[in-house]
Amino acid sequence: MKIKSISGNTSVSLKRSIDAGTEEQRKAVRGIIEEVKKNGNAAVSAFTRQFDGADVAGFRVSEEEIKEAYSALEERDLEIIQAAIFNIKEYHERQLATSWFYHRKDGTMLGQKITPLDSAGVYVPGGTAAYPSSVLMNVIPALVAGVDRIVLASPPGKDGKLSAGVLAAAAELGVTEIYKMGGAQAIAALAYGTETITPVDKITGPGNIYVALAKREVFGQVDIDMIAGPSEIAILADSTANYREIAADLLSQAEHDAMASSILVTDSETLAESVLKEVYRQLEHLPRKEIARQSIDNYGLIYVTETMNEAVSVINELAPEHLEILTVQPDALLGQIKHAGAIFLGRYSSEPVGDYFAGPNHVLPTNGTARFSSPLNVTDFQKRSSIISYSREAFRANAEKIAAFARLEGLEAHARAIESRNREED
């Protein structure tokens, strides 16, 4: 991590591009997908043995396994999951869109019909780690949207089991169609189906490069949420901010991934220098310090600007996944922020608050795509159909214009379709 003083129209970036994978990786993913399409369950089983070291007799999690998960989970952990569910549901229920219609004076009725997807597949990373928060953040928007069938897939550990936290989180949300499969083979099975797995309409959830490439490959057969890159945090701070807290928040993202990006933007050189020293001091005491060190060394940066307005401009150019505003009046700057996946205001809104508990979704656009993308939300699991009911009066008043417009585009059959009705009316 280093300090860089900038001013004026200096260009900034997150210092990396979305990983499109190597040609070898892309070829491997295409091969896995084709094998699953051809051989179904047998292919998924073979790849699970090869990549996860697990020999899973049946992919689907049984009721007994869910009961075992509840028994293995500490009561306090279950209570925390339940509290998070309440918060996340409460937030996402406010996003729910409904159908609407209106009438014109000529009797025309127009509208928009909102319909939930029939099915969704949620991918949850697994193996040596457990991410019940990914279950909550991907399943709850689909539930609120009204999706009837929600399927969960997660790679098993070498013992052939999924984590108790993941299973309990899914069960608390009423998801019981859970499969012990991961990687590109899971994405292929969800997209194309197997002898025992019915394909879904949309796939969401994070994963490694093979999962990301597989999602890219199956897009079009199914919808996907996004192709997310490594995690990012940007902190906008003035001289009133606490340098120890800033360092801790920067490291909270750095420990995710060696390619995670942690950036401070400030108009205070004194704060910048204090944060730089504190980051490396705290780093030494982290269990995942080697991963965090690679991230901080390669993708950590502190920008020092001359004014706070310049600092805000830097943030908008970065368009970060997570943005913390740690200034004397964070609310006053909110209106100036145009591009960020999630915005955390004030010292008590540390980024992990949003990761797990506050309510907003933690599936966020990365790598500057917050310029044109949004967090995962309820509308991602809903479709919109336009409704047109033209009255006789409206048709007769506009038929000539519509036919003329069709001929303007050289589409004679369109024009005649309109005129055929006019002739019937005469």
Curated annotation (Swiss-Prot):
EC number: 1.1.1.23
A Gene Ontology BP annotation from the UniProt entry: L-histidine biosynthetic process
Entry binding sites for NAD(+): Y123, Q185, N208
Sites where the protein binds substrate: S231, Q253, H256, H322, D355, E409, H414
Catalyzed reaction equations: L-histidinol + 2 NAD(+) + H2O = L-histidine + 2 NADH + 3 H(+)
Keyword vocabulary terms for this entry: Amino-acid biosynthesis, Histidine biosynthesis, Metal-binding, NAD, Oxidoreductase, Zinc
Cofactors: Zn(2+)
The keyword Oxidoreductase appears for this protein: yes
GO cellular component labels: cytosol
Enzyme class: oxidoreductase
Pathway given in the UniProt record: Amino-acid biosynthesis; L-histidine biosynthesis; L-histidine from 5-phospho-alpha-D-ribose 1-diphosphate: step 9/9
Cofactor mode of binding and number, as noted: Binds 1 zinc ion per subunit.
Cross-referenced HAMAP family: HisD
Family under the similarity heading: Belongs to the histidinol dehydrogenase family.
Protein name, entry field: Histidinol dehydrogenase
UniProt source species: Bacillus licheniformis (strain ATCC 14580 / DSM 13 / JCM 2505 / CCUG 7422 / NBRC 12200 / NCIMB 9375 / NCTC 10341 / NRRL NRS-1264 / Gibson 46)
Recorded name of the encoding gene: hisD
